[in-house]
Amino acid sequence: MLDIQTHMDFAGQGKAERWSRFIITFFGIVGLVYGAFVQQFSQTVYILGAGFVLSSLITIPPWPLYRRNALKWQKPIDTDAKSSSSESGDEGKKKKKQ
């Protein structure tokens, strides 16, 4: 099967958000200026929509540039050792008086 990576690290998420904001803002300004120049609000909406589509294609998929800072995970805790130590620890505790 295909080995498709689906994660994005925290730095990549921030980068994707900045790119998304920049692209949509840029296309919004260009669309507003062009729409005012040709006196067609529909052109503004079309240009903004194109910016949204471009922004989505650039920022939503987890491209490799958004996965450069891999997270360092801790080693898993052995659940058998943890459960046996918590059971023995409960025996030594006193119950509250009511």
UniProtKB/Swiss-Prot annotation:
GO terms for cellular component: signal peptidase complex. It comes from the Eukaryota. Residues 78-98 are annotated as: Disordered. It is found in: Endoplasmic reticulum membrane. Residues 1-18, 66-98 are cytoplasmic. The keyword Transmembrane helix applies. The modification Phosphoserine is found at S84, S85, S86, S88. Pfam families: SPC12. It is a multi-pass membrane protein. Disruption phenotype: (Microbial infection) RNAi-mediated knockdown reduces infection by West Nile virus (WNV) and Dengue virus type 2 (DENV-2). GO terms for biological process: protein targeting to ER; signal peptide processing. Its main location: endoplasmic reticulum. Keywords: Endoplasmic reticulum, Membrane, Phosphoprotein, Transmembrane, Transmembrane helix. Signal peptide: none annotated. Component of the signal peptidase complex (SPC) composed of a catalytic subunit twr/SEC11 and three accessory subunits Spase12/SPCS1, Spase25/SPCS2 and Spase22-23/SPCS3. The complex induces a local thinning of the ER membrane which is used to measure the length of the signal peptide (SP) h-region of protein substrates. This ensures the selectivity of the complex towards h-regions shorter than 18-20 amino acids. Component of the signal peptidase complex (SPC) which catalyzes the cleavage of N-terminal signal sequences from nascent proteins as they are translocated into the lumen of the endoplasmic reticulum. Dispensable for SPC enzymatic activity. This is Signal peptidase complex subunit 1. It comes from Drosophila melanogaster.
